[in-house]
């Protein structure tokens, strides 16, 4: 996903 929340995955 985007580097906002699920971006860490």
Swiss-Prot record:
GO terms for biological process: neuropeptide signaling pathway. The modification Arginine amide is found at residue 9. Disulfide bonds: none annotated. Keywords: Amidation, Neuropeptide, Secreted. It comes from the Eukaryota. The keyword Secreted applies. The keyword Glycoprotein does not apply. One of its GO terms (cellular component) is extracellular region. Expressed in the antennal lobe (at protein level). It is found in: Secreted. This is Tachykinin-related peptide 1.
């Amino acid at each position: 996903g985007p580097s906002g929340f699920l971006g860490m995955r």
